[in-house]
Design a protein with these regions (language model features):
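Short, cationic-aromatic polyanion-contact patches
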Residues: 72-87
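Strongly charged, low-complexity linkers/loops
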Residues: 68-70, 89-149, 162, 167
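Glycine-centered, phosphate/nucleic-acid-interacting loop/turn motifs that mediate DNA/RNA or nucleotide
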Residues: 64
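Short capping segments at the starts of secondary-structure elements
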Residues: 27-38
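Helix-turn-helix DNA-binding segment
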Residues: 60
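Single conserved hydrophobic/aromatic residue that forms the stacking wall/gate
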Residues: 1-10
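Short alpha-helical segments that sit at the start of domains
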Residues: 11-19
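Short helix-coil junctions and helix-kink-helix linkers
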Residues: 42-48
């Protein structure tokens, strides 16, 4: 019976650890919405094994507490007027959301919000330079790099700069 008692103790400890991981996952989601990957990574950093972290993510996912499609839609709705489509896609992919889920969320958000990337691009340029400004080559390179890093296409950048008579 002592062998059987040891096995019971091990099983009890495993169940306690599993429950601890699940509770931690739910506590993490109380503070902010997270992606599956974000929650999984956070549980690993908290010291849980890969198996326990995966179990906890599956547990909260089954109850609908974590939902990558919902996260992507909310993320896009919040940032659609501040960032380019490409930049938003890149950030969501870094958070572990697959491209198809992001595209579906983008289509849903774009129907409601109608993003105008050229207007956003114009606003970003106006923050730095007035229309009609004359820039030297170094300033122009910096401005172009700044806008390109934010995910704007080069054709759009050049045409907006031309429209604003910035050269």
């Amino acid at each position: 019976t002592s062998r059987r008692q040891r096995q019971m103790c091990i099983r009890d400890r495993d169940l306690e650890e599993r429950n601890r991981a699940r509770k931690k996952a739910m506590r993490l989601l109380e503070h902010m919405d997270r992606t599956e990957k974000g929650l999984y990574d956070r549980l690993l950093r908290a010291g849980f094994s890969e198996a326990l972290a995966a179990d906890a993510v599956a547990y909260v996912k089954d109850y609908g507490y974590v939902n990558d499609a919902r996260y992507a839609t909310n993320y896009i709705m919040y940032r659609i007027h501040d960032k380019s489509r490409q930049k938003i896609f890149q950030e969501l992919q870094q958070k572990g959301i697959d491209r198809q889920t992001i595209q579906s969320a983008w289509d849903e958000a774009a129907e409601l919000e109608r993003p105008d990337e050229r207007k956003l691009l114009r606003q970003m340029v106006e923050k730095k330079y007035a229309p009609g400004s004359s820039l030297d080559e170094k300033e122009m390179r910096r401005l172009y790099g700044y806008l390109a890093r934010r995910g704007f296409r080069s054709g759009d950048i050049f045409s907006v700069l031309e429209e604003m008579d910035i050269s």
